[in-house]
Amino acid sequence: MKTLAVVQHTSAEYLGLLEDHLEGRRIRFRYARPFATGGRVPGPDGLHDGLVLLGGGPWGSAGVRDVPTLAQEIALTRVALDTGLPVLGIGLGAQILAIAAGGRTSPSPLEFSVSEAERTAADALAGYLPQRFPLVVYGRDRPEPPETARILARDHEGRPAVFQVGTNALGFTGHPGTKAAIVEDLIMEFEEGPADPAANLARLRTLQRSIEDALVPIMTGIVKVLALMD
């Protein structure tokens, strides 16, 4: 039975729908919350069998409003990559993965968007990534993966939505297992928020079943690519 270290950047955003999929496969996860523990980030010994980096709400990585533990998390992610441990980055976590792998991030205002992503190849996520799937982004800044990364899906503007680094590291710009309640709590948690979230929240609620349905093959692909059941 494997255990994943999950770095949480806000009280509101957690694994969401991914929790049930992991528990159903007997994959354990342990949350680390640097924002609640004086900025304490797990050390290499705390990586267990893999690393998950979650989104950050209004926190980013491109210099405007960086998450306070950015440098430590980049270093930790590099340790995971260098030792061959699987890494899953979501939102801000995907930005941290991009930097740790030799890419960069670009500044972008805090956004809350509900749209659709399209895969770039039929074999993306070991063939399990749907051709089109809901893309819910709540965050600041954008990852620019290294040239060696493979872009698995793009958003409607052609930007990376899902990318793979090496054989067992994945970045998602949106949260594939998000819930409307997560976004609602993010809006309440911070003074900074999207200007008019009502329309996108309503759309997110109507798409909840589609998100759940898309997550079934997506999670199968994540588990396979990251070798979480091996």
Task: Briefly describe each language-model feature range.
Residues 1-5:
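Extreme N-terminal starter segment of soluble prokaryotic enzymes
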Residues 6-7, 54:
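Short hydrophobic segments within beta-strands
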Residues 7-9, 34, 92, 174:
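Cofactor-binding loop segments of dinucleotide-utilizing enzymes, especially the Rossmann-like FAD-
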Residues 12-17:
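Short N-terminal binding/cap micro-motifs at the start of the first secondary-structure element
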Residues 20-88:
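Flexible gly/pro-rich beta->alpha loop and the following alpha-helix that scaffold active-site loops
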Residues 79-104:
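Catalytic nucleophile loop
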Residues 99-181:
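Pocket-forming structural segment of enzyme catalytic cores
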Residues 178-230:
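Acyltransferase
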